[in-house]
Amino acid sequence: MEGSMNRDFEFKQLLRAYRSGIINDATFETEMKNLEHGASNGNGAGFTAFGKTYATEREAGIKFLEAVAPAETAGGEAIRMWLSTCKLDCITGGLKMVAERESYHGRAFAQRLTELGGTVPSASAELRESIAYLCDANMSDLEKLHTAATKFPNPDETIRPLFEFAEQLKEDQQTKEMIKLFAQDELSTLKWQNSLCAVLIEMKKNGQLAAAA
């Protein structure tokens, strides 16, 4: 019963996107086939991702996009705020690349969510609070980098669930490939920040870095 209600909701989302011109005939037809395929192959067990169980793969994908699209956009905005005050060239260079990545991730995922009939929510207060330190003018650049690095000390383990989720997706090949590339970008960012942080901390210990850095 619950699965049927979820499919009805997903169909209405698709129909709304189609009627409003957000998706074309081909996309609508493809997504309808995916929805029907998910219904015909359902075994009652649901689709499990990130420790939660969803009625369908489609529902899991939409929930993922709803969470990630605003988070990436907010991350890009916060990093640009940091860039406006950053004093270390090595950090500035990396931040420029990361800011662009975050922003285009947000745009691409928002577009995909809209194509699926979803609506992009605003970034939550909890999310904005968790990245507020990036905009804190009272923190040094190294302190900010160190804070970011300590949040994710093991990049491979942090990003592994994203790769696993992408591999689970069988029906939505568009979202699958987007998530795979997103995960590679995120892994690159985490490895960059952790590696650079270690180098700068060592330089500071040896007196090779200004105290204000």
Q: What is each stretch, according to the model?
A:
Residues M1-S4:
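Short, Lys/Arg-enriched N-terminal segments with co-localized hydrophobic residues
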Residues D8-S20, N24-A213:
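Non-heme di-metal
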